[in-house]
């Protein structure tokens, strides 16, 4: 028979352990690193990494963005309205402890609805980062952009592919995590999709009220067609 007192004692300890782990991550990346650490030295390498986010049937005709001096810029013009790029750490929620992690390289390829309504916010945030805007200022600017409807909620069907073997999405994953597709929905909808519930294939990320909900659905193969490991064999995101 289980002893309820054990759970009552250990749950606060578990919460404390999680909080300590978050504090350690925040301490590891308290501020922006030198900008060179976020760059990919060879432009062609960044293009190839961006295209690895999706199968060639999608990425070969997609627009490709690379990180420039003031923001992302078009390196390859597209034909199918998809956009591929390599996201950096500031794509995370404003309060994420890895917001300034210079190791993050997330190959990403967004579909047309996401390119119209999700990508512009990340591109603007990148411009702010490169201009030296603080996180608190970025929060205020984001809230103001939402109020004047410059930043919009994700369109229905907004999604992105993250199927690259070669990314580094977090220190927890230590690499690319699993190949997955991401769905973007208005803030606060993770529960509507059953995200994070026991045995649910959907994971969700809820950030602040000025950021959209992101849903993660692992898939069975990488962009090159090779099989992915089962979800339980991978580290956390």
Task: Give residue ranges: language-model regions.
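Bacterial N-terminal signal peptides that target proteins for export
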Residues: 1-8
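Bacterial N-terminal signal peptides
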Residues: 8-16
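Sec/Tat signal peptide C-region and signal peptidase I cleavage site
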Residues: 17-21
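Primary mode marks residue(s) on the alpha4-beta5-alpha5 output face of response regulator receiver
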Residues: 23-237
């Amino acid at each position: 028979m289980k002893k309820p007192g054990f759970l009552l004692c250990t749950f606060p300890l578990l919460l404390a352990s999680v909080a300590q782990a978050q504090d350690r991550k925040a301490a590891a990346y308290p501020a922006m690193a030198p900008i060179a650490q976020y760059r990919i030295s060879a432009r062609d390498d960044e293009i190839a990494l961006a295209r690895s986010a999706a199968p060639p049937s999608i990425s070969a005709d997609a627009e490709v963005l690379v990180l420039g001096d003031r923001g992302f810029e078009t390196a390859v013009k597209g034909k199918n309205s998809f956009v591929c790029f390599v996201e950096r750490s500031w794509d995370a929620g404003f309060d994420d402890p890895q917001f300034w992690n210079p190791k993050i390289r997330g190959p990403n390829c967004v579909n047309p609805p996401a390119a119209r309504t999700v990508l512009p916010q990340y591109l603007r945030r990148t411009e702010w980062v490169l201009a030296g805007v603080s996180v608190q200022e970025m929060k205020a600017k984001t809230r103001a952009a939402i109020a004047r409807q410059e930043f919009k909620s994700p369109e229905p069907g907004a999604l992105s592919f993250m199927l690259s073997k070669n990314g580094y999405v977090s220190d927890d994953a230590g690499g690319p995590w699993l190949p997955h597709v991401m769905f973007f929905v208005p803030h606060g909808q993770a529960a509507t999709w059953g995200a994070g519930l026991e045995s649910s294939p959907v994971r969700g990320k809820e950030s602040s009220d000025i950021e959209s909900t992101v849903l993660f659905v692992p898939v069975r193969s990488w962009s090159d067609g090779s099989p992915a490991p089962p979800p339980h064999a991978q580290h956390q995101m």
